[in-house]
Amino acid sequence: MLRWAVIFLVIALVAAVLGFGGIAGSAAGIAKIIFFVFLVLLVISVVMGRRKV
């Protein structure tokens, strides 16, 4: 799950760059939402994915 969170975080960042650059103005809002959703998923994956020794 951590791998997927990182992949979608990168996709969201690319979409944000395109959206904020004026290439696709309507994609900026979607990119913000996706970015924060997968940022939360990344944090959850890091915290829950730790193996206790």
From Swiss-Prot:
It comes from the Bacteria. Keywords: Cell membrane, Membrane, Transmembrane, Transmembrane helix. The chain crosses the membrane at residues 4-24, 28-48. Pfam families: DUF1328. InterPro entries: DUF1328 (IPR009760). Its main location: membrane. GO terms for cellular component: plasma membrane. It is found in: Cell membrane. It is a multi-pass membrane protein. Belongs to the UPF0391 family. This is UPF0391 membrane protein Patl_1732. It comes from Pseudoalteromonas atlantica (strain T6c / ATCC BAA-1087).
